[in-house]
Amino acid sequence: YYPDFAAKLTHLVYAINKSHAFNDGNKRTSIMAGVYFLLLNGWEAERAAHFAVSMEDIAVDVAANHIGKETLAILIMFVLSV
C-alpha cells in the first residue's frame, strides 16, 4: 500500500529501475513509466517533461546504488513541487 501519489510514483520508478527486467534500458523505462503515470493522472505534458529531464541523473544514481528508495522519494517530491 502506498499512501499518496508521490509514494506510488516513487515505487514505480524504483521498482522498474532496480528490477533489471531488460538487458538495456531499465533506467529509461523507469523514467518513462513515471512520465506515463503522471500523464495518466492528469499532469500537464510540460510538467511530465520536466520530470523526465530532472530524473535522468537521479535514475543513474539509483541504478548505481548511490540513492536508496527513501532518498528517491524525497527527490521525487522535490521534482514534483518545482
Regions found by a protein language model. Name each.
Residues 1-82:
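FIC/Doc superfamily catalytic core
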